[in-house]
């Protein structure tokens, strides 16, 4: 048996078509495009590539995208002032600060400064809390993309055993919560977990986000499992580098029923989910039309509407 390769680009295109239609309806109704502001600090090559991809996708989806590029020596206070400005801007529905940030800037302070209703990455504690309690809110883009990819090949999620390898606040923890909210039975593993291979072999759905190239091998995977590889690792080769995931694709494809490739799997869905979150923010903000800001630049907003 050779696994079905889940085409993340094709699934992302289908989601993007839906989001584009929503964006056009929004523009027709409210006389402006949904707006996304992307903030990049420094000149990290990988971050620059990611920002370019996001802004280009936004424009092709009917979202007005603005880029704010700041030098690497930008102070934390200066960055926070920019975020305050974007929070107040009624033409900006979503704010994304590209990670990682320079060492002198605390990411927690920056991400918490973004209004929860404009937090398209879903990283604000308010949105994390809504996800944890099973309420509607903005879900981090990569976990949301993982769920959509699984739904594209799995007839039923209820009661499925899901194992998430990795406990980062960006992917691992929210991914576990996303599948728990879908009525799956979820186990989350990390570097201190015992018998990681054994736990992985219990998974009907295996989500790997460990940041370790080729970590999950063929003998770690239950026959027929769905494997979602979130890892993106650069491996040096004679011509430069190649991208590989956290899963040994060549071996695991002969055991799994379906598997995502790297590249071309989770990555495109992450960007598509970002567009979906941006339009959702625009729709919610337009409906509520909030007029009052609190002193700390938090909108009086019913987050369950997002």
From Swiss-Prot:
InterPro entries: Aminoacid_DH-like_N_sf, NAD(P)-bd_dom_sf, THF_DH/CycHdrlase, THF_DH/CycHdrlase_cat_dom, THF_DH/CycHdrlase_CS, THF_DH/CycHdrlase_NAD-bd_dom. GO terms for biological process: L-histidine biosynthetic process; methionine biosynthetic process; purine nucleotide biosynthetic process; tetrahydrofolate interconversion. NADP(+) binds at residues 166-168, 232. Keywords: Amino-acid biosynthesis, Histidine biosynthesis, Hydrolase, Methionine biosynthesis, Multifunctional enzyme, NADP, One-carbon metabolism, Oxidoreductase, Plasmid, Purine biosynthesis. One of its GO terms (molecular function) is methylenetetrahydrofolate dehydrogenase (NADP+) activity. Its EC number is 1.5.1.5, 3.5.4.9. Pathway: One-carbon metabolism; tetrahydrofolate interconversion. Belongs to the tetrahydrofolate dehydrogenase/cyclohydrolase family. Catalyzes the oxidation of 5,10-methylenetetrahydrofolate to 5,10-methenyltetrahydrofolate and then the hydrolysis of 5,10-methenyltetrahydrofolate to 10-formyltetrahydrofolate. Homodimer. This is Bifunctional protein FolD. It comes from Methylorubrum extorquens (strain CM4 / NCIMB 13688).
